[in-house]
């Protein structure tokens, strides 16, 4: 907007002041990459023990996720506009607590919980942003995950290869992503229903995962 001639002060602060102008002029602007989609793809690479590079992202925007993945034992390389996660045979459980940016994103909490189901040891996930943000827990448990949910806290007892295929139902956008990620490592064929939730935040996620080698397809019912 400023590039178009708007009079705006306070960008990056808690108070923004806007002074009206007669008209705005055309301008070219690059949209900020979706850090949540980028983070989901990084977790997909990690949970499957893969080697994945996400390009055209802003590593600074995912610093909290990168730090937690490194704490868990993953090797993460960052470039100017890319992040690479390297495979590891085992990783350890780490605790996360969601917080406003630059803290750990609530919109990656469910996906990270799926990752922690495969970790060595116990993880504690604390949700500070939204109520009722653990609706995916019941479906992960249906797949075999060992998770104890409480009001704002969920305790995840991880163990590799502990998930088995089952029909599961997406309850919201990020929950659907976590179930897809869990399905990638569950033994057998996992069916995730109500994936219209997924489409609200991801563009052809199944095609991107298939391009990385996942055995996944969208089925019309």
Predicted features, each with a name:
Residues 1-221:
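Short, structured segments at the rim of ligand-binding sites
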């Amino acid at each position: 907007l400023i590039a178009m001639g708007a009079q705006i002060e306070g960008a990056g602060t808690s108070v923004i002041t806007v002074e009206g102008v007669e008209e705005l002029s055309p301008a070219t602007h690059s949209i900020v990459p979706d850090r949540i989609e980028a983070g989901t793809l990084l977790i997909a690479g990690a949970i499957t023990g893969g080697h994945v590079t996400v390009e055209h992202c802003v590593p600074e925007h995912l610093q909290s996720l990168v730090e937690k993945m490194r704490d868990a034992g993953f090797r993460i390389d960052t470039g100017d506009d890319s992040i690479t996660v390297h495979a590891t045979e085992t990783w350890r459980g780490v605790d996360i607590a969601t917080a406003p940016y630059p803290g750990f994103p609530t919109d990656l909490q469910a996906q990270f919980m799926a990752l922690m189901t495969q970790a060595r040891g116990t993880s504690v996930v604390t949700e500070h942003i939204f109520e009722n943000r653990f609706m995916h827990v019941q479906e992960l448990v249906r797949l075999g995950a060992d998770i104890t949910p409480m009001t704002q806290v969920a305790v995840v007892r991880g163990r590799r290869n502990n998930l088995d295929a089952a029909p599961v139902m997406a309850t919201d956008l990020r929950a659907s992503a976590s179930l897809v990620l869990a399905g990638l490592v569950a033994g057998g064929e996992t069916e995730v229903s109500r994936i219209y939730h997924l489409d609200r935040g991801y563009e052809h996620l199944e095609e991107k995962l298939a391009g990385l080698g996942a055995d996944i397809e969208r089925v019309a019912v």
